[in-house]
């Protein structure tokens, strides 16, 4: 594994963009809006979101709050800037079946999530990948909703 690049060249505006994308991606997933996701993520990520939207199991995610973020790796490749950002955020989240029955989670409780989101700058930053943070299990394995899961707004 190559060592992480030093986080140089990122500006406060870049950090605001990453936090904004966290909120915007969750909002677009809540609305099941692939068109909105097309302006927030790469075509490959939009395809993954679309595949998850077709599931009979979906997430209800509300009140996403970014707690901490730090650059993990920043690099340029083929003339494009990339950044992997470790994010810790909390949200209210439940996993429901197609009938709206809660399978996992509690509507009144908050869950804390740690993930690394990778972005690519194509004029503006776009979401390129989401990975569980090192040393943590995948949210799906814990029964915790994922940003890319089928997400509906809370009733």
Question: Which residue stretches match the model-derived regions?
Answer:
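Short, charged/polar low-complexity linear motifs in solvent-exposed/disordered segments
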Residues: 54-56, 102, 144-147
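A generic structural signal for ordered secondary structure
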Residues: 22, 83, 125-127
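Surface-exposed, charged secondary-structure patches
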Residues: 57-106
